[in-house]
UniProtKB/Swiss-Prot annotation:
Binds directly to 16S ribosomal RNA. It comes from the Bacteria. The gene is rpsT. NCBIfam families: S20. Belongs to the bacterial ribosomal protein bS20 family. HAMAP family: Ribosomal_bS20. Disulfide bonds: none annotated. One of its GO terms (molecular function) is structural constituent of ribosome. The lineage of its organism: Bacteria, Pseudomonadati, Campylobacterota, Epsilonproteobacteria, Campylobacterales. This is Small ribosomal subunit protein bS20. The keyword Phosphoprotein does not apply. GO terms for cellular component: cytosol; small ribosomal subunit.
């Protein structure tokens, strides 16, 4: 355990930041999983709705500074490509 006041503060800050990051990572994983499941089930309306939610959530994480703009664009692009595949089929 830390002895200095500043070191104790840093430990608390790190714990808080770690918890927040874990929440955001899980959120991204869950929303992308929802799109994947809808696409695998070939449910067009569910896939479109899940994609709409995923797009909004991912871009909100960009505005919070959790992920970079290019990373969000790549994730959204891949999800959109999957949704378009079942649209064409």
């Amino acid at each position: 355990m830390a002895h200095h006041k500043s070191a104790k503060k840093r430990i608390l800050q790190t714990a808080k930041r770690t918890e927040r990051n874990r929440y955001y990572r899980t959120r991204i994983k869950n929303i992308t999983k929802a799109v994947h499941e809808a696409v695998e089930a070939a449910d067009m309306t569910a896939a479109q709705e899940a994609f709409k939610v995923a797009n909004k959530q991912i871009h909100s994480l960009v505005s919070k500074g959790f992920i970079k703009k290019a990373t969000a664009a790549r994730k959204v692009s891949r999800l959109h490509k999957m949704v378009n595949k079942i649209e064409a089929a």
